Amino acid sequence: MPILKQLVSSSVNSKRRSRADLTAEMISAPLGDFRHTMHVGRAGDAFGDTSFLTSKAREADDESLDEQASASKLSLLSRKFRGSKRSQSVTRGDREQRDMLGSLRDSALFVKNAMSLPQLNEKEAAEKDSSKLPKSLSSSPVKKADARDGGPKSPHRNGATGPHSPDPLLDEQAFGDLMDLPIMPKVSYGLKHAESILSFHIDLGPSMLGDVLSIMDKDQWGSEEEEEAGGYRDKEGPSSIVQAPPVLEVVPPLGRQESKASWDQASMLPPHAVEDDGWAVVAPSPSSARSVGSHTTRDSSSLSSYTSGVLEERSPAFRGPDRVAAAPPRQPDKEFCFMDEEEEDEIRV
């Protein structure tokens, strides 16, 4: 498209050039659009192929022209032209503006009757065949509601009423009421037909959420079983594990005869006293054995065999967990004393 001449000069104080400078050479060749085939200026000047405008103007009656000229309501194009006229330069006089207003009315009458432009005249649009209207206007739900109620049909905005569609199914598919939708066969995939135009259903197939939740539940069950098993072990643990009671060390004397005498005195103690007081006779510690010497090995072996027999008979660990739980702890007998003053040098706690 060729570049138009500059309408405004570079100087700020210079006035806008007159529109008389516009010529037909400024209009480009037709490019497939009706806007490039002709031009109608604001002052009534027209360029290009305007034969259809003149033919329409000749066919119009004098009465229709008088009614349109004397109408109080101006057309849509005349309003636009008047609004654009206000944005023009203020330096023009009132006389020039009056001439412009008169030419605007004339040009509006010409353009109003153009076939390529929208219908602006209600009388001419009413005379047109209603079959040329789009199908959405002829099958509007407003018309259907009026026809169903038996009331008068309300005319459309352009004053035309469309013909009734013979096929109701096609009419519904094009544009119709929400309550009268055709019944569609059910799809084998389980999709439901939307009850409203604004709603729809989407089926994304089987979901993996069920598998994920089942795996999570299995993990939770395994952790709970482990916790229960651990708690059962903790409950049985203290009963099955026997804590080591305070050790009663028997320090053998330097002489073998004295050690035998002290061992006889220790063996004469009643077994229930050993059990009640929580004492256990064990073998002498390695430090004491090293300090005494090698002559005490025979006494220590006999002492360990005796203590093992006592533990097997009297220890609560060999009774079983049920008997241990049933037997209450017994307080030590304060009146009974198995340590004499003579044995304090030989037996010590």
Swiss-Prot record:
Q: List residues of the CRIB domain.
A: 27-41
Q: Which organism is it from?
A: Mus musculus (Mouse)
Q: Which GO terms describe its biological process?
A: cellular response to type II interferon; positive regulation of pseudopodium assembly; regulation of cell shape; Rho protein signal transduction
Function, as annotated, reads:
Probably involved in the organization of the actin cytoskeleton. May act downstream of CDC42 to induce actin filament assembly leading to cell shape changes. Induces pseudopodia formation, when overexpressed in fibroblasts.
Composition bias type Basic and acidic residues, residue spans: 123-132, 311-322
> What UniProt keywords apply to this chain's record, in alphabetical order?
Cell shape, Cytoplasm, Cytoskeleton, Membrane, Methylation, Phosphoprotein
Where composition is biased (Low complexity), the residues are 280-308
Membrane topology summary: Peripheral membrane protein
Localization recorded for this chain is: Endomembrane system; Cytoplasm, Cytoskeleton
Name the family: Belongs to the BORG/CEP family.
Q: Which residues are recorded with the post-translational modification N6-methyllysine?
A: 5
Q: Where is this region: Disordered?
A: 123-172, 220-240, 278-349
Superkingdom field:
Eukaryota
Please list the residues that carry the modification Phosphoserine. 18, 64, 103, 107, 116, 136, 138, 140, 154, 165, 223, 285, 288
Q: Where is the composition biased (Acidic residues)?
A: 338-349
Tell me the subunit arrangement.
Interacts with CDC42 and RHOQ, in a GTP-dependent manner.
Which lineage do the record's taxonomy fields give for this organism? Eukaryota, Metazoa, Chordata, Craniata, Vertebrata
A single Gene Ontology CC term: phagocytic vesicle
Protein name listed in UniProt: Cdc42 effector protein 4
Gene of origin? Answer: Cdc42ep4
| Tissue expression remark | Ubiquitous.
